[in-house]
Amino acid sequence: MSSVNLAEKLSLFSDHWTPKIVSSFNGHDVMVVKVKGEFTWHSHADTDDFFMVLKGQLTIQLRDGDVHLNEGEMYVVPKGVEHCPIAKEEAHVLLIEPAGTPNTGDPETAATITAL
């Protein structure tokens, strides 16, 4: 088994808001994603949502206030909490979610997540 170089994986694609699976463990997917602009308001009824900023800055809008994340910072959105990620400039983010979790809360989007 070899290590995973996240910067190398991130260099393989340029699209935004399309998570790519880089590893899996205990029924969870470890993903990297490039983000820029505003995503959509959504929630996950059955799971928390883990965000860790690898590069840049990310704001996670919540209905009761915003969470601002810088490089090296993380935040977990509790299950059922509506949120909307925003990045003014391109940011690189690490996500960890149960395998097959839709990135918008809509089951159709789970099928669009690919592995690198």
Labelled PLM ranges:
Residues L6-W41, T47, G105:
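A short glycine-rich, His/Asp/Glu-containing loop-to-beta-strand
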Residues L62-R63, E71, A87, G105:
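Short glycine-/acidic-enriched loop or helix-start segments at secondary-structure transitions
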Residues N26, L54-K55, N70-E71, E89:
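A cytosolic small-molecule/anion-sensing beta-strand core signal
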Residues K34-V35, H44-Q61, I96:
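Short, conserved beta-strand element in jelly-roll/cupin
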Residues R63-G80:
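Short acidic-glycine-tyrosine-enriched beta hairpin
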Residues G27-D29, K36-E38, K55-T59, D66, ...:
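Short, charged/polar surface micro-motifs in flexible loops or helix N-caps
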Residues S2-L10, S23, K88-L116:
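Double-stranded beta-helix
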